[in-house]
């Protein structure tokens, strides 16, 4: 089986870190040991610097919505071209904490940036490059933000309004309904059930990949 790019998506507090551990365990059970992890924004020295600016902002200078999305795509193209594509080319599997769907949901849905602009940015920056599988962890924003607050201080985006996260979630669900490579898992369930659902999704998907 050729190397694959698997992405975990979801709102704050959805449990992406736990989900990534579950995915790694499952892949290793199938004999896939050669893999790396990425996160967005971030994953390269330049992209990590952009991550800090996006997450925390700059004191005294509001970050405009368009500047935010352009910084995200700058970080993304650095990661894809310098890390993800080379890894896949040498036979390494890549498990990513967020990818382009986050921008489509957060900036396109949450910020309300024009859909045509978001599509144009994606196509210009990424071309036809897409994850092989995206697991979207869905849960009500109220639950996710409560979990996020329990982790500690919230960043600039996590401090957004509930309406912002409602719009973001709606855009996630919209994309998931349209794209067969995006599988939705109910992340409001107990963690054991979420893990079991992820196992099932991966088991079925890996069988499909093995059977061609």
Swiss-Prot record:
State the top-level EC class: transferase
Residues recorded as binding ATP, renumbered to this chain, are 10-17
Enzyme Commission identifier(s) = 2.7.4.9
PROSITE patterns with a match to the protein in the record? THYMIDYLATE_KINASE
UniProt-listed Pfam families: Thymidylate_kin
- What does the UniProt record say this protein does? Phosphorylation of dTMP to form dTDP in both de novo and salvage pathways of dTTP synthesis.
Instruction: Report the InterPro entries cross-referenced here.
Output: P-loop_NTPase, Thymidylate_kin-like_dom, Thymidylate_kin_CS, Thymidylate_kinase
Name the record gives this protein? Thymidylate kinase
Q: Is Nucleotide-binding given among the entry's keywords?
A: yes
Instruction: Name its GO BP terms in alphabetical order.
Output: dTDP biosynthetic process; dTTP biosynthetic process; dUDP biosynthetic process
Tell me a GO cellular component. cytosol
Q: Write the gene name.
A: tmk
User: What's the domain of life for this entry?
Assistant: Bacteria
Which GO molecular function terms does the record list?
A: ATP binding; dTMP kinase activity
Task: Say which family it is in.
Answer: Belongs to the thymidylate kinase family.
* Disulfide bridge map: none
What UniProt keywords apply to this chain's record, in alphabetical order? Answer: ATP-binding, Kinase, Nucleotide biosynthesis, Nucleotide-binding, Transferase
Specify the species. Answer: Photorhabdus laumondii subsp. laumondii (strain DSM 15139 / CIP 105565 / TT01) (Photorhabdus luminescens subsp. laumondii)
SUPFAM superfamilies listed in its UniProt record: P-loop containing nucleoside triphosphate hydrolases
Catalytic reaction equation(s): dTMP + ATP = dTDP + ADP
